[in-house]
A protein has these predicted regions:
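Bacterial Sec-dependent N-terminal signal peptides
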Residues: 1-21
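Low-complexity, acidic/polar, glycine-enriched regions of mature
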Residues: 17-183
Length: 183
């Protein structure tokens, strides 16, 4: 779905960052959209990623990769049309790479964290900002929750159609996520 960007972070300090693999059992990423017939949802089932921490255990690098063919709606025809819209043979992954992070405290436990980075989606790369709620869990893991609205056409995707064009998918989608990195 997205081209894998070979450099995790553009600065040398990030390349020296401690890297923590994502815990897939508690990674949840869903795509929600609409059509002229009904709303639809797809769940990502193959998610990988890394979290980079500086010497103060603060986040300074994030890379998340989703296999396009792991997006499942429960409807094989819709799944196939989605994979075609992503041109999955050329763009097998969706990738988000952090370039900037800002944080403000919401409570003793939660912080509002704005993640800015490059999202590679169907072969196009766009800079996006995502507002998340983040926290360090009691076990020392890093949890980020949030959602981000996107338009398929911003990534040069043609929203899928079915039944000879009578069923049309809306351009807007929302990606919802709850991702925990092992600390």
């Amino acid at each position: 779905m997205i081209l894998l960007i070979s450099i995790i972070v553009s600065t040398p300090s990030i390349l020296k960052a401690q890297s923590c693999p994502i815990i897939p059992l508690i990674a949840s990423i869903n795509v929600h959209g609409t059509s002229n017939v009904h709303d639809w949802d797809m769940k990502a089932t193959n998610i990988t990623g890394e979290l980079g921490l500086n010497g103060y255990k603060q986040i300074n690098a994030i890379l998340i990769k989703i296999e396009v063919k792991s997006l499942k709606s429960g409807n094989g025809i819709m799944d196939g049309k989605t994979y075609d819209a992503f041109d999955f043979k050329k763009n097998p992954y969706i990738v988000f790479q952090l370039t900037e992070i800002s944080q403000s405290k919401l409570s003793d436990n939660d912080s509002e964290i704005t993640l800015t980075g490059n999202l590679s989606f169907a072969g196009a790369i766009r800079k996006i900002s995502i507002k998340t709620v983040g926290k360090i869990t009691k076990s020392g893991d890093y949890q980020l929750k949030g959602s981000v609205p996107l338009k398929m056409t911003d990534f040069k995707m043609k929203p899928p159609t079915a039944m000879l064009g009578t069923m049309k998918t809306g351009d807007a989608v929302t990606i919802k996520f709850d991702v925990t990195f092992k600390g």
